[in-house]
Amino acid sequence: MDNVVDPWYINPSGFAKDTQDEEYVQHHDNVNPTIPPPDNYILNNENDDGLDNLLGMDYYNIDDLLTQELRDLDIPLVPSPKTGDGSSDKKNIDRTWNLGDENNKVSHYSKKSMSSHKRGLSGTAIFGFLGHNKTLSISSLQQSILNMSKDPQPMELINELGNHNTVKNNNDDFDHIRENDGENSYLSQVLLKQQEELRIALEKQKEVNEKLEKQLRDNQIQQEKLRKVLEEQEEVAQKLVSGATNSNSKPGSPVILKTPAMQNGRMKDNAIIVTTNSANGGYQFPPPTLISPRMSNTSINGSPSRKYHRQRYPNKSPESNGLNLFSSNSGYLRDSELLSFSPQNYNLNLDGLTYNDHNNTSDKNNNDKKNSTGDNIFRLFEKTSPGGLSISPRINGNSLRSPFLVGTDKSRDDRYAAGTFTPRTQLSPIHKKRESVVSTVSTISQLQDDTEPIHMRNTQNPTLRNANALASSSVLPPIPGSSNNTPIKNSLPQKHVFQHTPVKAPPKNGSNLAPLLNAPDLTDHQLEIKTPIRNNSHCEVESYPQVPPVTHDIHKSPTLHSTSPLPDEIIPRTTPMKITKKPTTLPPGTIDQYVKELPDKLFECLYPNCNKVFKRRYNIRSHIQTHLQDRPYSCDFPGCTKAFVRNHDLIRHKISHNAKKYICPCGKRFNREDALMVHRSRMICTGGKKLEHSINKKLTSPKKSLLDSPHDTSPVKETIARDKDGSVLMKMEEQLRDDMRKHGLLDPPPSTAAHEQNSNRTLSNETDAL
């Protein structure tokens, strides 16, 4: 490119200047006068070996090619800004737009130039032109299209330019477009801003819709899960009611019922666990007919529950789980299969009966041989004395019935009727228990000694158990508010109320049992006492050798030793009682007769002419004790006979006994006499006096002085003890009397009598006014 004569050399200034410009011609001539002007180039000569021969096209016809391509793309062109209104200007415009008629078509590859090449500014918005800014000219045309209703004239011009039919040579239209270009740009910005706001709002609405759809799907899934759980619970309940479920767990572990959902892969933690809180951990549908909650660990037929036997033989018949007095082929106790008693058969003595719970290894070996029910009964009754109570295994439809089953409905299912004599383990497969959360009649905890080890429970001597059962039956009253003790109805659970207040000792003579058996309020614990029962068929009472009386002391009972005492009677009341340990001198239940429970946890006093309301049960009970003169807290100070309802009142009263009763003439008080004497001997007040025997206060504390001295002595007492004739004591009394008279402590002030008279007058006036 060093050689300027090179035909490939192109001056860059030609792209920015018009060839007709004088400055361009002068500059071009000055650079290299030997190079001819562009018009002098013989570009269309066929014999010339130039660019046409190499590329097969005219080099200077490239502008026409680009213009034609831009027209095919429907991109409008802008004329040169230097064009005017003259005819020469119109030619320049035509040359700039390069418009051809039908006879003069533009050919892309023709070797002959259709128009002379004039290197000028491109009219497209892509390559730019003079005065061009960063905003595309296309956008201004589009905004003018949007504002067609406001300014229709530019739209007509744009349509003409878009259709390429005619070109207006009047520059006023372009000036008009440039004038409206500012307004169009403002409107375009407003529209773009509104479009952006609408787009953002639309995106937010889409997000909200997606959240709502997700929440709806979650709700549908949750409802489906709940529906499945309800269906599973209904299926399990139907299986339990029909008795179709069988125990498939080991003894001592809760039963896990396999539902269809669990079989599909549900975890074991989600299994439905059937629990109970009965005495032996059994669970059955329907529940057994119990007269009242059991208060003993002893089994119904007089022998402890055989936990080891159930664990060793879990697959045996239900009657093998406990001592059954019936034939081995009978699985349940029916209404007609009741016990009959006769003296010719097995004897049962309460004193001679002993039984072990197979806790040692020797008893385990013996258990393997005792498989049949008859052998167990025979071996058990062999140990009884001949003078005991006899039980016959005969089963007869006319056998006598216990008074506990007289009110049983025969039309009821057999399992209801068997609930009194038959343990729970004989009514349904065993399901070991868990603690139940809901406290109802069937889930009341059994009364057990918490201090006794678990492995030692149910292993007491039967004589001791029977004695405890006698005590519980004689002490435990009927449930308040129940007219009879028929089988529990399917209604709301009854409330079991116990009052823990001091009670009287029960009668120690337990030989008279006839009123106990004939009483209508009996529980199933009294089944443990084997007594003659009236025979309905012969209408006579069979005589038996009298059983030795069982004496019972509630204060010495090992079973009830750790529990709070139970009352010997409970007076019916309308409000439930809470467990309180407040001492009282009144009979049990007396205070609660005057308590009325109101809504909003309020309590009203029912004492005549009182009707006070309290917020706490403790406060109303203390208030009623004041009405009834019940003051259990008495002062133990010598000579004091005061008593109080509450303990803190007694404590406050005792402080008054320890008041500072030793007074110095200066007005200072002391609790002890020796402290007063030491104070006076120091001569630091007006009442100071030098005594005959100086008293030196020890620097040690009172506790150390008591530990050092074997006897509780004081200097004053020692001085008085050394006085044989009493002269020192007389002198001390005279000095004290003189000092008190000197300070006016013996003679009352003259205004005291007048003050008492005035107070008496005011009291009399108040009583007259009332």
Swiss-Prot record:
Pfam families: zf-C2H2. GO terms for molecular function: cis-regulatory region sequence-specific DNA binding; DNA-binding transcription factor activity, RNA polymerase II-specific; RNA polymerase II cis-regulatory region sequence-specific DNA binding; sequence-specific DNA binding; zinc ion binding. Residues 705-745 have a biased composition (Basic and acidic residues). Keywords: Activator, DNA-binding, Metal-binding, Nucleus, Phosphoprotein, Repeat, Transcription, Transcription regulation, Zinc, Zinc-finger. The modification Phosphothreonine is found at T259, T486, T501. One of its GO terms (cellular component) is cytoplasm. A zinc finger (C2H2-type) spans 603-627, 633-657, 662-685. The keyword rRNA-binding does not apply. The modification Phosphoserine is found at S80, S122, S247, S249, S253, S385, S392, S483, S564, S709, S714. It is found in: Nucleus. The keyword Zinc-finger applies. Residues 77-97, 286-323, 699-770 are annotated as: Disordered. Plays a role in regulating basal-level expression of CUP1. Activates EGT2 transcription in the absence of SWI5. Present with 538 molecules/cell in log phase SD medium. This is Metallothionein expression activator. It comes from Saccharomyces cerevisiae (strain ATCC 204508 / S288c) (Baker's yeast).
